[in-house]
Structures are given as C-alpha cells and as structure tokens.
Amino acid sequence: MRVILGSDLDGIKLKAEMKQYLLQEKVEVIDKSESASEDFIEATLAVAHEVLKDTESLGIVFDGYGAGSFMTAAKIKGMIVAELSDERSAYMAREHNNARMITVGAKIVGTELAKNIIKEFLTGHYAGGRHQIRVDMLNKMA
C-alpha cells in the first residue's frame, strides 16, 4: 500500500508526525509537500492527482480544518474523499463509500486521534455489493 500525503501551512506539523507514524508502520509514503504548500488547493490537487494514477494508493491531506481540502478534492472526477475527525467515519468511508482520500483538520484533530483515524482508514476494505450503486453515482457526478 502506498499513501500520498500533503499539507498546507496549518497542517505541516501534523503531517510530519503522521508521516513518521506511517513509516514506522512500514507503509510506503510519498510526500507531495515536503515543505508546506501555501494554499490547501495546491497540496490537495497534488495528492489527488497522484492517488488517481494508482488504484492501490490512498491519499491524506492535512490543513487547518479539513474542509477546504475536502471541497477541493470533491471537485475532481473519480475522487471519492471524506473529511474526517473520528475513527468510525474513517473506517466506514472505506468500507461503504470506497473513499480513496481523506482530509484532516490539524486544528481539530490531535496526534493520537489522527493516528487512529489513519489506522482505521488504511485497514478498512471496500465491501462493494449494494454500496457500489452509490459509488457509481458519485463517480458520475464529478
């Protein structure tokens, strides 16, 4: 599994902490913003486009509140994204919605919660079946 990371100035510290966490967990990490992007849009687009190149990749963007990056990624055709601040939603975003990318607000989510969100997001597996109908609907929208 490969995880693509990005952040703006507000998310750079949490992104760095989560990058270390992922590397310790033996996850392949690609950091699209080694130095923080000045704007969440730039960081989000870099991560989303990289994720869409490889069906096995997932993306995580850190900004101040998660909302801006979410709105940006949701505009990209083929990208299913969730703005997250709890573990259960992270798991369900993968299992029922086949989310390939999440956004996390560094001013809302602390280090330990971010680790748990990422763990649930990465361990969730898309269930398919009846959920595929809504995934197809989402993919037709953008």
From Swiss-Prot:
One of its GO terms (molecular function) is ribose-5-phosphate isomerase activity. It catalyses: aldehydo-D-galactose 6-phosphate = keto-D-tagatose 6-phosphate. Signal peptide: none annotated. Pathway: Carbohydrate metabolism; D-galactose 6-phosphate degradation; D-tagatose 6-phosphate from D-galactose 6-phosphate: step 1/1. It comes from the Bacteria. GO terms for biological process: D-allose catabolic process; galactose catabolic process; lactose catabolic process via tagatose-6-phosphate; pentose-phosphate shunt, non-oxidative branch. Keywords: Isomerase, Lactose metabolism. Pfam families: LacAB_rpiB (PF02502). The keyword Isomerase applies. Its EC number is 5.3.1.26. Belongs to the LacAB/RpiB family. Heteromultimeric protein consisting of LacA and LacB. This is Galactose-6-phosphate isomerase subunit LacA. It comes from Enterococcus faecalis (strain ATCC 700802 / V583). The lineage of its organism: Bacteria, Bacillati, Bacillota, Bacilli, Lactobacillales. The gene is lacA.
